[in-house]
Amino acid sequence: MGPIKTIKKKKRAEKKVDRNVLLAATAAATSASAAAALNNNDDDDDSSSQSLDWWDGFSRRIYGGSTDPKTFESVFKISRKTFDYICSLVKADFTAKPANFSDSNGNPLSLNDRVAVALRRLGSGESLSVIGETFGMNQSTVSQITWRFVESMEERAIHHLSWPSKLDEIKSKFEKISGLPNCCGAIDITHIVMNLPAVEPSNKVWLDGEKNFSMTLQAVVDPDMRFLDVIAGWPGSLNDDVVLKNSGFYKLVEKGKRLNGEKLPLSERTELREYIVGDSGFPLLPWLLTPYQGKPTSLPQTEFNKRHSEATKAAQMALSKLKDRWRIINGVMWMPDRNRLPRIIFVCCLLHNIIIDMEDQTLDDQPLSQQHDMNYRQRSCKLADEASSVLRDELSDQLCGKNSSA
């Protein structure tokens, strides 16, 4: 099933959202140009020193005069260094397409002003009217600036989200935290809840199992909670296994283009290929290991589920952190544009990775939650092939043996 065939633009939007699958080969070149842009910040009109001057004037105009860095971080949820880097990414697009953006008093908005508006909109989840009132501009200006920012980030920040060419470090970290060998990622799905008119028949496809209208985001995550692959846009009515099987990630793995590295021997007749882990909502596959459902019936099953749970925490916490920091996709969105929403979700994922890549520790002192889908029950998928079940059993036996001899 395709994602909403009645919307002609939908497939184009999804292809754009899942483009990290297609653009991995160009990531290095894009990364180099972005690094050059970052290194040239000293020569930019928006360099660090001038950016400090901008915050001084901006904060006095909007927030009553506090120029404390902590105030900046509480407003935008990122450090000044990260903010300046994001400005450097979008500068070319914002200046190449001049627009007469101004506040309510007719004062032109600088690059930093516009990035601030977009980040506040994405980070706070506040309505266009509230953002407009806060920043002293009309709602349409807030909307146009935010969308231009989203379009620019899709292109300029794509190198921050791509499948890695080497997985050794990722596998090593997963084994260190969970004891699972050859694990390359953790997968999970979260719901972006929307308020849609229930009387419209076309909206029924968005109605999920918890009676919410929602759109899904599927993410594969590394041990550092960094997104490696994402796809957004499928209706919440679809089960996790259906979303998975319609994703670019699934198709690439099935074609042997992902998770195709070194295999580890488990026994004389069984090898453990590269794989990811996911909860019981996903099918048990040779490359996707899920936990034993119900109450474990043996020590090996108990040991496997324990280790599996440690590995899957990365995906759960990453999605929780994403929705907590970029609150436009948290809570309930009021009648969003369903063609644009997947692209907004994708840019929030890019921003999430940028914060990690910049080693930005803003808000790191806040406790991490594993709950990213409040009031959603865990659903179970019964799909499993015999070979995958045998593989999981042999891995469980080996893990239990290692544990016993430790």
From Swiss-Prot:
GO molecular function, one term: nuclease activity
Keywords of this entry: Hydrolase, Metal-binding, Nuclease, Nucleus
Domain DDE Tnp4 intervals: 187-353
Disulfide bonds: none
Domain of life: Eukaryota
Motif (Nuclear localization signal): 8-15
Pfam families: DDE_Tnp_4
Catalytic EC class: hydrolase
UniProt-annotated binding residues for a divalent metal cation: 188, 240, 279
Task performed by this protein: Transposase-derived protein that may have nuclease activity.
Protein name: Protein ALP1-like
Organism: Arabidopsis thaliana (Mouse-ear cress)
